[in-house]
Curated annotation (Swiss-Prot):
Matches recorded under SUPFAM superfamilies: S-adenosyl-L-methionine-dependent methyltransferases
Gene3D superfamilies in the record: 3.30.2300.20, 3.30.70.2810, Vaccinia Virus protein VP39
Enzyme class: transferase
Protein's name according to its UniProt entry: Ribosomal RNA large subunit methyltransferase M
GO biological process per UniProt: methylation; rRNA processing
Annotated GO CC locations: cytoplasm
UniProt record similarity statement: Belongs to the class I-like SAM-binding methyltransferase superfamily. RNA methyltransferase RlmE family. RlmM subfamily.
Family annotation (PANTHER family): RIBOSOMAL RNA LARGE SUBUNIT METHYLTRANSFERASE M, RIBOSOMAL RNA METHYLTRANSFERASE FTSJ DOMAIN-CONTAINING PROTEIN
Record-level Gene Ontology MF annotations: S-adenosylmethionine-dependent methyltransferase activity
Binding site for S-adenosyl-L-methionine: 184, 217-220, 236, 256, 272
Source taxonomy: Bacteria, Pseudomonadati, Pseudomonadota, Gammaproteobacteria, Pseudomonadales
Active-site residues (renumbered): 301 (proton acceptor)
Domain of life (superkingdom): Bacteria
Length: 352
């Protein structure tokens, strides 16, 4: 199992290559990354047979920015038109018994077509795996991840459930709320799922908390905060959706989001403004560093080139700034499924 397969947003294969190559070099695990433009996946081929397993053991998946999902295996294999299950059972003879099964496809137009095949194939495959003793429901065992590039080509991979994506392919199935004024609302909801354990939502996303939404109009992110019954200051020169204003929980301030400062410390600051990432990074540094908020979710809009390098530079600057202030801040950064040319940062200031 010398190959690490990683899913990603189409067009960001180069960022995944740069990110995993940097980590592998730091960990002294030799190998090379390979990908094709807009293929929505990257393979990192390790020189050592156990290289992919070592990478997954040494890295936290949650700390990776651009990969949506990962799995280790020997690479893609060919399947015949018939007797696919028999071929897969033979391939799995050298694998450990697995505790769960996910059939995955790539986030491409071709992948959408393959998903129909996967839905039909999963039931008989699952039954055959259970009968052969290759699959038993046990969250402590590795997850079997079968990534189909077509009905005839599959990556037979493994991953630990607690150190891989929360959802198949790293894609959450969130329902757009009809009352929300824009689809951007799903970005904030996905961020909460990604960065906050579900068991902590009632404590960290509680009613009557104070929140500030910078660049709020028309109110996609504000809607999520109001839906949690928070009291929100919506900062934007543009108009807010009327249904949000009728809630009685929103104070609309028509000022520049980068200039606004709250009169008192708030629980949450969220921001989805189209601006250069360095300026938004400085905004984060101020709000968290000066204690204006306890937690923040902020989108960084990415440049056309050197996107991974730019994000890494901003995150490093934030860490150095907080360290210099003697602050303990948990920082997370991920390109979410609902993100486009951007990444989402989550920051939580902890009291020492």
């Amino acid at each position: 199992m010398n190959t690490l397969l990683m899913h990603c947003r189409p067009g960001f294969e180069g960022e995944v290559c740069a990110e995993i190559a940097e980590h592998a070099a730091t960990l002294e695990i030799p190998g090379y990354a390979k990908s094709k433009p807009a293929s929505a996946h990257v393979e990192f081929v390790c020189q050592d047979a156990d290289g992919a397993e070592r990478l997954m053991r040494r890295l936290r998946f949650a700390d990776l920015i651009f990969p949506r999902q990962w799995a280790r295996g020997p690479g893609f294999i060919e399947l015949p038109e018939s007797q696919r299950i028999e071929v897969l059972l033979a391939e799995l003879a050298s694998y450990p018994v697995c505790g769960s099964l996910w059939l995955e496809v790539l986030d491409t137009n071709a992948g959408k077509e393959v998903s129909t095949f996967c839905r039909k194939f999963e039931k008989p495959l699952r039954a055959a795996l259970v009968k052969a003793g290759r699959l038993q429901e046990d969250p402590a065992l590795p997850r079997l991840l079968l990534t189909f590039r077509s009905g005839r080509e599959v990556f037979v991979g493994l991953a630990e459930p607690r150190n891989s994506a929360l959802w198949p392919m790293g894609i959450p199935r969130l329902k757009f709320p009809r009352e929300a004024p824009s689809r951007s609302t799903l970005k904030l909801e996905e961020a909460w799922h990604q960065f906050i354990p579900r068991s902590e939502w009632d404590k960290r996303l509680a009613p009557d908390m104070l929140a500030v939404d910078l660049g709020a109009a028309p109110g996609g992110w504000t809607w999520q905060l109001v839906n949690r019954e928070m009291r929100v200051t919506a900062v934007d020169n543009g108009p807010m959706a009327e249904n949000l204003m009728y809630s009685g929980l929103v104070d609309h301030q028509k000022v520049d989001g980068y200039q606004y400062r709250p009169r008192q410390r708030v629980d949450w600051m969220v921001c989805d403004i189209v601006e250069k990432p360095a300026r938004t990074g400085a905004l984060i540094e101020t709000w968290i560093g000066e204690g204006l908020c306890r937690e923040a979710v902020v989108n960084l809009k990415l440049p056309m080139k050197q996107r991974y390098a730019e994000v890494r530079k901003i995150l490093q600057r934030l860490r150095e700034s907080f360290d210099a202030r003697g602050l303990k801040v948990v920082i997370g950064c991920k390109q979410l499924y609902h993100d486009r040319e951007e990444v989402t940062c989550h920051l939580r200031r902890l009291e020492r």
